[in-house]
Amino acid sequence: MKHPIDPKQIPDNLIRLISDDWMLVSAGNTDRWNTMTASWGGLGCIWGKPSAFIFIRPQRYTLEFLEANDTFSLCFFGPEHRQALSLAGSRSGRDFDKMHGLGLTARDSGGTVVFDEARLSLICRKVYRQDMAPGCFTDGALISDFYSASDYHRMYIGQIAACTADEE
């Protein structure tokens, strides 16, 4: 059973949750949506509001959905869904039906898509986006290590509008 929680009460280690356990970033509605696995991002506070920060490369199909919609979701799963997250991160929704291929149950919530199987879901209202620029890096090694194709991430900031978690 899902219940709403205050984002400040998320019981997990946020660095482990995002970088090790991964998350699905989704945008759209159940008529037309896409999701992708991400391990780069963060949660915190900006402009006095609990917020999420995600980073999406320009070639990712999910970027089109993030641009076209005002909300997006971040969904976190238990280890039993690791294979679905691996698949969502390795196959593009341009040529793979993620609705049926991931084995997850998508539903509309708060203007975007979440998954019934997620143990934690954040619905975020998009408030800011900006492309990373090579001239802004203070550590040039990051450019050679991560951006040899000059495919710099676009950062999105979303204010957390709703947060639901499984009952403990």
What are these regions (language model features)?
Residues 1-38, 42-168:
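Active-site-proximal mixed secondary-structure blocks
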